[in-house]
Every structure is written in C-alpha cells, then in structure tokens.
Amino acid sequence: MNALKGRDILALGFMTFALFVGAGNIIFPPIVGLQSGPHVWLAALGFLITAVGLPVITVIALAKVGGSVDALSHPIGRYAGGLLAAVCYLAVGPLFAIPRTATVSFEVGVVPLLGESGTALFVYSLAYFLLALAISLYPGRLLDTVGRFLAPLKILALAILGVAAFLWPAGPIGTAQPEYTQAAFSQGFVNGYLTMDTLAALVFGIVIVNAIRSRGVQSPRLITRYAIVAGLIAGVGLVLVYVSLFRLGAGSHAIAADASNGAAVLHAYVQHTFGSLGSSFLAGLIALACLVTAVGLTCACAEYFCQRLPLSYRSLVIILAGFSFIVSNLGLTKLIQVSIPVLTAIYPPCIVLVALSFCIGLWHSATRILAPVMLVSLAFGVLDALKAAGLGQDFPQWLLHLPLAEQGLAWLIPSVATLAACSLVDRLLGKPAQVAA
C-alpha cells in the first residue's frame, strides 16, 4: 500500500490529536481565561502559538527527517542531541508530566470531596502510582482496551464541555490580573509552554511516522505529506478545545474568582452547570484519562532509557513510578510553579531547533548556525527562568531591561542577532573541507 485512503488519514489525524490531548492540557486555558478577563482572546492568541502552532510545526519538522529527534538534532552533535532528547523525555516523564497526571485527577476528583490535605494527596498518589506501576509492568491488552474505550469518551466529554461553555457561561467576564493587563499576549505565549506539547512532539514524532509506515507508506514525500495533514487535523482539534476552555474560564469569575489553578476553575464550572452527577462523571473521566497518560508516558520513558542505561525495563518502571510519586506530593499548584522556570529555560532552544530545521539548505554548515543560536537562546532562556523563579533581583539593570525581557522573551532578539552573525560567518567560510579518509 503506497497511499492512504481518506478514512486512514482522518484516523491518523485523530490519533495525533489524542497524543497531544492529555488531561493536564485542559487545566491551563481555564485559568488563563479567568485571569486575563477582557484580554482573554489576546492571551489566547499567544497561548495557541506555543500550545498548538509549535507542536504541529514540530511534527512536520520531524516528518521531514524520518521522525527521530536524534536526526533532527544531528547538526548540533551526538552528545548535545542526546542531552536534548533526554531532557525532553524527563520533562514529559517523571519531572513534570507524569506527576501532573496524579495531581490533576486529585484536584478534580478528591479535593471537592475531602478538601486540600497533604495526607489525602499522599494516600491517593500512592494508590494511583501503584496501579500505574502494575499496568506499566504488565501492560498486555488492558491498556489498548482502555485506550479504545477512553478516546471517544474523552472527545465526547470535551465536545459537550466546549458547547456548554459558549451556550451556558457561568457569568460575565471578570477583571484581568495586572500581568495580563500589561502584556496579555506574552503571558499567554509563556503559559503555552506549560502544556509541554512541543517537547512531547519531539518525543512521539517517531510514533506518528511509524504509524504512517505501518500502513505500507514508504515514500518520504508521502510520509511528510500525511504527517502535515495529521498535524493540521490535530491542530484544528486543539484550537477548538482550547478556545472553548478559554471561554469557560473567562466566564467563571463569579464562581471561581479565587481559584489557584485550572482544575479548580473546571470543577467549579462543571458543578455549577451540570450538578453533582456531572461533576462525578468529569472526575472519573479525568482520573481514567490521567492514569492512561501516566502509564503511556512511564512505558515510553522506560523503553527509551533502558536502551541507554545499564538498567532493565522493569527496574526503570519502578524508579520512574517511585520518583513521580514523590514529585506529585508537591501538589498541582506548586508543581506548576516549579515547572515554569524549567520550561522557560528549555523551550527557547527547542523552538530554535524546530524553526531553523526548515532552513538547513540555506547554509553551507548547519552546525555553524544551529549550535551557537541554540546556545544563546538557552543562555537567555535561563535568564528568563531565573527571573520567573524570583531570583533576578541582583542582576545588572541592563539584563533586566533587555528587549522583550518584561514579556519573558529576552532570548528572542539575541537569538536573531546570533543567527544573522553566524549566517554571515558561514557565508564567508564557505563549505567545510572534506576530511580525507
């Protein structure tokens, strides 16, 4: 089979959409919508660039090089590329994404019943990760069965929630918090990092390409074309989900004005609109979705690291589950606070890598361009991260007042300047000399 039928392409698009939509993704648009008030759509535009546009572009970039993040990062060298891949796996694994699945389901399903309690979170997360561990050690056919059952149910629930957000808003749009009044677009842009979908796309891009190849497609041109179509289908789905959740959050000021995270906003709206039965349904759905996501990420991380470390798959599953359990006990709000500086630091070089991968043919040596620009973007990303963590008080004033620094995008101008300088040097040096055998 050399070409996919229409229904196969559509199925590929839905699969890509399902890969991106984890339970954690639905908690960020509501809180941004709530806090941005009348500036909600400007904040949404910034959010959609990093939470939808970049992941879709990343899928396309990976498809052009065969789906592997190692191939995409080849110009920066084997060790730097391996470090980048490891950081992506750790971020979408035990550092943030896996623990977040437990805290999201706890916030939505348990907190409304028992309230905030460290003991309750400890007991819940222990049971949660023991179950995730058991399934990850012996996935068998259980995960496939749950996945086939869960995917349409989750899409249906999101569709109902999205329609309800526009038909039955909880109230009028409230006032914006100061940071959104001053810079709604950039606040949305940086908050889009929290979905971690660009990092996730770097990890599972190979899954999408392999899914195309499994249908008998071998032509690189067709693989790239189908990956682009799948990415666009997923992108449209993500935009619809996010826009409806922004509207939900923006209209929830009357019922969730003091919410500290999106899970609280979401629960308040569902409780207000659908009552206790709807709230229980949402809690059960998100708990199941979170568990499936946790198992999938645990398996993926264990399979990746067992090929690179002298540890067995089973040992790594146990280590990953145990570490995720410990991190999850920070709680959702604290976990998000910790993740913001880290993601602020590592996102810029990933953005640079993906964006410049489309321009490789313009230079004599991609290494001369990518390595310096990524290094500069990382350095200034770390600067933004330190400021986001509240550690920038002692910085020189010129560092605090770089172009776009107030918007958390201090890395952008230096990266563009480095790109221009390196492009000029590359043009002057010409093609690298071939090493004689």
From Swiss-Prot:
GO terms for molecular function: L-isoleucine transmembrane transporter activity; L-leucine transmembrane transporter activity; L-valine transmembrane transporter activity. It is a multi-pass membrane protein. One of its GO terms (cellular component) is plasma membrane. The chain crosses the membrane at residues 9-29, 40-60, 79-99, 120-140, 155-175, 189-209, 226-246, 277-297, 316-336, 342-362, 369-389, 399-419. It is found in: Cell inner membrane. GO terms for biological process: branched-chain amino acid transport; isoleucine transport; L-leucine transport; valine transport. Pfam families: Branch_AA_trans. InterPro entries: Brnchd-chn_aa_trnsp_Livcs. PANTHER family: BRANCHED-CHAIN AMINO ACID PERMEASE BRNQ, BRANCHED-CHAIN AMINO ACID TRANSPORT SYSTEM 2 CARRIER PROTEIN. NCBIfam families: livcs. Belongs to the branched chain amino acid transporter family. Component of the LIV-III transport system for branched-chain amino acids. BraZ is specific for isoleucine and valine. The LIV-III transport system may be H(+)-coupled. This is Branched-chain amino acid transport system 3 carrier protein. It comes from Pseudomonas aeruginosa (strain ATCC 15692 / DSM 22644 / CIP 104116 / JCM 14847 / LMG 12228 / 1C / PRS 101 / PAO1). The gene is braZ.
